[in-house]
Design a protein with these regions (language model features):
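Glycine-centered tight beta-turn/hairpin loop motif at sheet-sheet or coil-to-beta transitions
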Residues: 31-35, 103-105
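Short, flexible, surface-exposed loop segments at domain boundaries
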Residues: 1-26, 47-110, 119-142
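Short, structured beta-strand/loop micro-motifs enriched in basic residues and often containing a Trp
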Residues: 34-44, 110-119
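Residue-level signal for the start and early helices of compact helical domains
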Residues: 4, 29-31, 43
Length: 142
């Protein structure tokens, strides 16, 4: 799948409101640019199946090719939601065979303790290069 149109929004959950059905909710994020609302439903990939709670920092990705209502605060359908760990950054990017991000902003160095998993949490046994990767990282050198 091509994720090039996915846009990340990082913020702290201000509120979680149950939706009209059993599998949806509205998550309000407090970001540097103000409040942004996200619809989260059964189609949303929530990494590690984390329970979303008020006060939690998350990165929510939306598809900028999908139509959105022209309202304020902005409202998007969350395609992916990830919760960064302490001092972690998250990046969704296409990486080449040398594990360099397509925008040249990050070069991955896979060590013995690096976990490479599929979206559903299974171990990924192939080389991770030449693919779209959702990367959690904490240390970079420039």
């Amino acid at each position: 799948m091509d994720y090039s149109a996915f846009v990340p929004v990082t913020g702290v959950i201000a509120n979680v409101t149950r939706g009209g059905d059993c599998c949806s909710q509205m998550v309000s994020l407090r970001t540097d640019m103000g409040i942004v609302n996200f619809h989260v439903n059964a189609d949303t990939l929530i990494i590690d199946n984390r329970q979303l709670r008020r006060g939690m920092e998350i990165v929510a990705y939306y598809d900028s090719n999908l139509p959105v209502p022209l309202i304020f605060p902005p409202q998007y359908h969350a395609q992916i939601v990830a919760v960064p760990g302490r001092n972690q950054q998250i990046m969704l990017n296409q990486f080449d065979r040398n594990l360099r991000a397509s925008d040249q902003s990050l070069q991955l160095n896979i060590g013995p303790g690096t976990q490479v998993r599929t979206a559903n949490g299974q171990n990924f046994g192939c080389p991770p290069g030449n693919q779209w990767l959702l990367v959690f990282y904490s240390v970079t050198t420039r």
